[in-house]
């Protein structure tokens, strides 16, 4: 028995129209994705091209070792006997002292050098590199310790009451707080109230509190992703709650926890406002390990790459010398963040291949 074909719905959209709309939606989504990627590539390419001129050089050893191994200096540009000179602060003082000594020996008045000075446009960024690495490692260590502990409590021990829901809501709201607010919080609590002054420890704690929401949220999701059967099997064998978490849950959640650390590194390393109030100096003569006592290491300020970029960029008017330092510093800064993130990704992938279910 055959049935007559169903009458066509006059209100239904035509197939050709549906296909056109579907293709249009796909094209729009693709263009949006390409636009985001292109914008990021343009920014990175501009920094890489202009920064490479500062970091690399044409002659051996092909790397500007002065820029990577020396502290920042002011640049002095002047003309002497028809020759144009560009010297850093120390070299300029030595050069001027030598000329004055020669003039004094000859019984002549000292020559007058009319030099234009550009702050922090000479020298290097070695103390800034060291300070940035110390700030990232210390703050992420504190953030992972507190964040994973909080995530374990919320995921494994806490119930579903109103207090727990309020805590989760507060954590989500903290993720949207501007970094300048965290900087003022760290300044008021750690620098003033606790008397730590501008120091590594104050910067570590401030940055750790700032990145805690990201670490807690990602770690809690990683813990929840571990199958419940792992917990039940461990408890059935007589293990305690903590033994179950330590042996049957945390190892399998580590890849997700390291993902949160990668996100945290990207944010911590690039923040300027928090460290400007709590940890960073514009210039400092001593390196972090040049201290008299071990405890002085934690209560000293450091120089940092993002703050150095801010200081150099804020010099008005802008000039070619300062711009060279800006892009060179930004290029090195991106490389450091990329290397730290790449190391975290390698560790995460190794753990992911080791702990599978």
Residue ranges and their predicted role:
Residues 139-171, 192, 345-353:
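Transmembrane-helix boundary motif in ABC transporter permease subunits
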Residues 71, 275-333:
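Interhelical loop and adjacent transmembrane-helix boundary motif
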Residues 171-208:
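Generic hydrophobic transmembrane alpha-helix motif, especially the helices
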Residues 218, 241-281:
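Transmembrane alpha-helices
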Residues 41, 45-122, 295-296:
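Short membrane-interfacial helix/loop motifs at transmembrane-helix boundaries
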Residues 1-33, 345-357:
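Transmembrane alpha-helical segments of polytopic membrane transport and secretion proteins
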Residues 35, 122-153:
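Transmembrane alpha-helix signature in integral membrane proteins
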